[in-house]
From Swiss-Prot:
The keyword Transport does not apply. It comes from Homo sapiens (Human). One of its GO terms (molecular function) is rRNA binding. This is Large ribosomal subunit protein uL16m. Disulfide bonds: none annotated. It is found in: Mitochondrion. Transmembrane segments: none annotated. PANTHER family: 50S/60S RIBOSOMAL PROTEIN L16, LARGE RIBOSOMAL SUBUNIT PROTEIN UL16M. It comes from the Eukaryota. Component of the mitochondrial large ribosomal subunit (mt-LSU). Mature mammalian 55S mitochondrial ribosomes consist of a small (28S) and a large (39S) subunit. The 28S small subunit contains a 12S ribosomal RNA (12S mt-rRNA) and 30 different proteins. The 39S large subunit contains a 16S rRNA (16S mt-rRNA), a copy of mitochondrial valine transfer RNA (mt-tRNA(Val)), which plays an integral structural role, and 52 different proteins. GO terms for cellular component: mitochondrial inner membrane; mitochondrial large ribosomal subunit; mitochondrion. InterPro entries: Ribosomal_uL16, Ribosomal_uL16_bact-type, Ribosomal_uL16_dom, Ribosomal_uL16_sf.
Length: 251
């Protein structure tokens, strides 16, 4: 039997070497397989999919507010750590989430995930900040316009959506990156390990920095009178945040 198999596979193993034909040496390799992860401590909730988000808050009357762009400036102080899951979408900049963004995230993730082995939860509240707008061709004046829609402010460093379950990061990274690419601010898919590695790398860059002319030193010493063009936010955040934008390469 083995002789017949060798005759059948011999033409398939022949490759041209110079002007002659030769057989490739057949050898058996030893594979080192990684251990299969066990998800014994993972529990799937009763409703694993993302819930529907209301377009407007359910309150009797909403007061019109000024722009207040400080709600998307600087680093986030809430929803920066994992709670139940192991994977999430991390915001790398500030911005506003409209109701359409919530629907895009909900439909894409719910259609791509396996509800028997995965679950997803929101880490941002429903739209609550009113945005006013006047009609096209309307004359100036007449007070503030009527409320047009509602948004959710998001700061840099906040987790937008969190996922978990009996799965690995490679299984969810594809559609999480697809969702992150469509958000109105810079974002990326991360896991617990990658998020911790990002923070350690940033700390190591600051600790091993060889350039003595850092932003903090220049601003603190008021070199060339730079204080007159800096804001208090620049002194607090050491120049790493420029409005809603986050600059991780600045040390």
């Amino acid at each position: 039997m083995w002789r017949l198999l060798a005759r059948a596979s011999a033409p398939l193993l022949r490759v041209p070497l110079s002007d002659s034909w030769a057989l490739l040496p057949a050898s058996a390799g030893v594979k080192t397989l990684l251990p299969v992860p066990s998800f014994e401590d993972v529990s799937i909730p009763e409703k694993p999919k993302l819930r529907f988000i209301e377009r407007a808050p359910l309150v009797p009357k909403v007061r019109r507010e000024p722009k207040n762009l400080s709600d998307i400036r600087g680093p986030s102080t809430e929803a920066t750590e994992f709670t139940e899951g192991n994977f999430a979408i991390l915001a790398l900049g500030g911005g506003y989430l409209h109701w359409g963004h919530f629907e895009m995230m909900r439909l894409t993730i719910n259609r791509s995930m396996d509800p028997k082995n995965m679950f997803a939860i929101w880490r941002v509240p429903a739209p609550f900040k009113p945005i006013t707008r006047k009609s096209v061709g309307h004359r100036m004046g007449g007070g503030k316009g009527a409320i047009d829609h509602y948004v959710t402010p998001v700061k840099a460093g906040r987790l937008v959506v969190e996922m978990g379950g009996r799965c690995e990061f490679e299984e969810v990274q594809g559609f999480l990156d697809q969702v992150a690419h469509k958000l109105p601010f810079a974002a990326k898919a991360v896991s617990r390990g990658t998020l911790e590695k990002m923070r350690k790398d940033q700390e190591e860059r600051e600790r091993n920095n060889q350039n003595p002319w850092t932003f903090e030193r220049i601003a603190t010493a008021n070199m060339l009178g730079i204080r007159k063009v800096l804001s208090p936010y620049d002194l607090t955040h050491k120049g790493k945040y420029w409005g809603k934008f986050y600059m991780p390469k600045r040390v």
